[in-house]
Amino acid sequence: MWYSNTEDVKAEYADVFYLVSTRIFHEENADGSILYVASNTPEQKAVLSKEMAFVSNNLFPDSLNFFSPFYHQLTLEAAELGSETYNRMSSDVTAEVYESFRYYMDNLNGGRPVVLAGFSQGAFLVKKLLKMMPPEDYSRVVASYSLGCGVNDDDVSTGRIIPAQGADDTGVCITFNSVSDTSAVWPLAMDKCSHCINPVNWTVGAESAEFSYDGQDLTVRLDTSANVLVVDGYKESAPGFNVPWPEGCLHRYEILFYNDYLKSNVLRRVNNFRKSL
């Protein structure tokens, strides 16, 4: 089953294939035992649809076709089991997402360029897809946006994940993670990060950039040692929910902070890619 932004596909431009973040916190059997994979009940799909609708409306230009599969995601409780266990448990989820991508490319894409994007668990799966897809599909990827999941040297060594160096390059991976301090790095999403880009000024250097969110004037800079974004000045206006990441980790804000910058950048890269066809 799919979430899409239009019944009338715009055949002449480009698509977005988006993988939603971890939205299901807890799942259990009838006997009360914990399940670590969501069942995709109607109620759960309604929760996933909220993020899909938000990113379709706020993160991507209206001129792009938007497709997002309802995959059986790992729950947030699975993230508390540690990186090794989480990676092992993700194999079935990865296989399902690849099958969805294969169906999309064979039946829905129509030969158009595609922007591959995901947030959090979705970003983790974006990296998996890039490594798995055949060359003919890879050649049609405008860029990939792995938001809230770091890229490390092992990823880059595959030759399929090429870190973005600016605002205009295509065939690259845009990746970043935000914290208030480098002590707040969340190992599951940010461990061994070797690449990062600042989505406000689109540089891979340490130059600071100013932006606003929730009525607050903020500054963001890339810490080139930890390869994460350090956001100065943000004060949460509402309490957060119970999460397994360190205090000061701004993981939940990756899309909220930067959606305007990302939206214009997606269109910029699509236009550049189409010029090269």
Predicted feature descriptions by range:
Residues 1-7, 12, 45:
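Basic, amphipathic N-terminal segments that precede the first structured/catalytic domain
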Residues 12, 19-111, 238-277:
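Active-site catalytic motif of lipid deacylating hydrolases and related acyltransferases
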Residues 27-28, 77-78, 124-127, 153-157:
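Extracytoplasmic/secreted cell-surface and envelope-processing proteins
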Residues 8-10, 56, 114-115, 129, ...:
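Bimodal feature
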